[in-house]
């Protein structure tokens, strides 16, 4: 992916659903991953919560967004909003 002249590494992008937007300029997203258990071969779902910087306060609960890793913005924020993939209905 390219943004202007910059190349963006896909390993730095996280796709997730917004679960909270109660903080100013910050949203919390849940990123789910699926892995196969090495011994039992069952697909296991793991999820993590990430705090994302939303400069314009444009995300609402239920939106699907892409977040990109960036420098630390606060104690817990290490990601910023890249783009909104799908708006909530």
UniProtKB/Swiss-Prot annotation:
> What would be one Pfam family of this protein?
Ribosomal_S17
Q: Name one GO cellular component term.
A: cytosolic small ribosomal subunit
Q: Which UniProt keywords apply?
A: Ribonucleoprotein, Ribosomal protein, RNA-binding, rRNA-binding
Task: Write down the superkingdom of origin.
Answer: Bacteria
CDD domains noted in UniProt: Ribosomal_uS17 (cd00364)
Q: Which cysteine residues pair off into disulfide bonds?
A: none
Tell me the Gene Ontology biological-process terms attached to this UniProt entry: translation
Asked whether the UniProt record includes Lyase among its keywords, one would answer no
Flavoprotein as a keyword of this entry, yes or no, is: no
Q: What does this protein do?
A: One of the primary rRNA binding proteins, it binds specifically to the 5'-end of 16S ribosomal RNA.
> What molecular function terms (GO) are annotated for this protein?
rRNA binding; structural constituent of ribosome
> How does it associate, per the subunit comment?
Part of the 30S ribosomal subunit.
Q: Describe the family membership recorded for this protein in Swiss-Prot or TrEMBL.
A: Belongs to the universal ribosomal protein uS17 family.
Q: Where is the signal peptide?
A: none
This one is known as: Small ribosomal subunit protein uS17
């Amino acid at each position: 992916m390219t943004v202007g002249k910059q190349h963006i590494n896909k390993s730095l992008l996280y796709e997730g659903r917004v679960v909270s937007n109660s903080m100013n300029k910050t949203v919390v997203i849940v990123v789910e991953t699926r892995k196969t258990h090495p011994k039992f071969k069952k697909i296991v779902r793991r999820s993590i919560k990430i705090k994302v910087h939303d400069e314009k306060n444009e995300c609402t609960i239920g939106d699907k967004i892409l977040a990109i890793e960036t420098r630390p913005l606060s104690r817990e924020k290490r990601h910023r909003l890249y783009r909104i993939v799908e708006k909530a209905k």
